[in-house]
């Protein structure tokens, strides 16, 4: 089998994770920590790309990586327009939306730009894979009870789809042939209904929908939320923080550290026990609802993300949902590996690269 060497780039707010893979095998994985004072010199996140590019190249050189031997560069997908899942070639339309922050400004927007900047000088392809804006929801799933307020698809697409593919392989099937319920449990929690390779419904794990999580509120009583918003006690930013960042376990028990909460549970703390069980209860309830989306025809339920390492949490969830389908646990997440595998599928011609096309007010993914 021929060897494809792939450079993978995953930018964060103060760090850049990079990996070099020979096919699926990691040759180098490193987290580059950026000096906050250095980063602070740039007015916009997007202005950091040249600095980060040079830093990446220096690190590769220091490890003896010859970039002329690369076959492709793959970056973390950023806040683009809604697109279907898959591996996309970085093109001018995508670069424009990433640079302009079409759907928001975030460090992940640098992923496609850095991939392109490095790849173009080597005359090799640049890709992104399954960004958080992946949207494969069916029309019926978008409807909410208020006109003009459509449900949105924002979830852990990269890890959900990567793990779903691994489970399909484990079951000796193609991802596109199975119905799976995939639950990513980390700082946020998302439950996706995967129907034959498409996530046709999923809770918005960012903006207050679904189970509460270590630091997100999830679905809350809307009437009480409206009263709180107009009580005059809180600014808009404070309310947003209550939903994202200071919600969930942070609000209920004062920490987003699930390990600490587990220790409290093991010591018999009744409040911690009730709250941790409530989080598992809400995850199980979301899985149960998602099973109806797939008419109860489920090949497997998959639990993944950092919280899937928690035996207490996993056992609580299993107890409530294992009657629906077998529960398969794939703890943790490996974004670098997932990005490399997405690029590899295209390089091996197992799937065609998709093209990011902007037509007036819509984005079209053309395979």
Curated annotation (Swiss-Prot):
Protein's name in the database: Probable butyrate kinase
UniProt entry tagged with the keyword Calcium: no
Similarity comment: Belongs to the acetokinase family.
A single GO cellular-component term on record: cytoplasm
Encoding gene, per UniProt annotation: buk
One annotated GO biological process: acetate metabolic process
Reaction(s) catalysed (UniProt annotation): butanoate + ATP = butanoyl phosphate + ADP
EC number: 2.7.2.7
Database matches in PROSITE patterns: ACETATE_KINASE_1, ACETATE_KINASE_2
Pfam families in the cross-refs: Acetate_kinase
UniProt keywords, alphabetically: ATP-binding, Cytoplasm, Kinase, Nucleotide-binding, Transferase
Intracellular or extracellular location(s): Cytoplasm
InterPro entries named in the record: Aliphatic_acid_kin_short-chain, Aliphatic_acid_kinase_CS, ATPase_NBD, Butyrate_kin
GO molecular function: acetate kinase activity; ATP binding; butyrate kinase activity
């Amino acid at each position: 089998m021929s060897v494809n060497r792939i450079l993978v780039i995953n930018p964060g707010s103060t760090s850049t994770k990079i990996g070099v893979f020979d096919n699926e095998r990691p040759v180098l994985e490193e987290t580059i920590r950026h000096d906050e004072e250095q980063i602070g010199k740039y007015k916009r996140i997007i202005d950091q790309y040249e600095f980060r590019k040079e830093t990446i190249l220096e690190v590769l050189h220091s490890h003896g990586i010859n970039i002329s031997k690369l076959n492709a560069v793959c970056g973390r997908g950023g806040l683009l327009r809604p697109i279907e899942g898959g591996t996309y070639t970085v093109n001018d339309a995508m670069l424009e939306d990433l640079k302009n922050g079409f759907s928001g400004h975030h460090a992940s927007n640098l992923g496609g730009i850095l991939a392109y900047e490095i790849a173009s000088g080597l005359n090799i392809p640049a890709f992104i894979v399954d960004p958080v804006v992946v949207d494969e929801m069916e029309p019926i799933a978008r409807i909410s009870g208020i006109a003009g307020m459509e449900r949105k698809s924002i979830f852990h697409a990269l890890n959900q789809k990567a793990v779903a593919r691994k489970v399909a392989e484990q079951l000796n099937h193609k991802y596109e042939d199975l119905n799976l319920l995939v639950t990513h449990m980390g700082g946020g929690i998302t439950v996706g209904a995967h129907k034959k390779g498409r996530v046709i419904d999923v809770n918005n794990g960012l903006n207050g929908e679904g189970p509460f999580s270590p630091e997100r509120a999830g679905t809350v009583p809307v009437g009480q939320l409206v009263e709180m918003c107009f009580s005059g006690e809180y600014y808009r930013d404070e309310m947003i923080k209550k939903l994202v960042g200071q919600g969930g376990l942070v609000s209920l028990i004062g920490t987003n550290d699930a390990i600490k909460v587990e220790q409290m549970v093991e010591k018999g703390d009744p409040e911690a026990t009730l709250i941790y069980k409530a989080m598992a209860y809400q995850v199980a309830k979301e899985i149960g609802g998602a099973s109806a989306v797939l008419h109860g025809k489920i090949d497997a339920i998959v639990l993944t993300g950092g919280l899937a390492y928690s035996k207490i949490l996993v056992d609580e969830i299993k107890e409530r949902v294992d009657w629906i389908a077998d529960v398969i646990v794939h703890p943790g997440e490996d974004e670098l590996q997932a990005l490399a595998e997405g690029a590899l599928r295209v390089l091996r011609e197992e799937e065609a690269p998709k093209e990011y096309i902007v037509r007036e007010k819509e984005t079209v993914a053309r395979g």
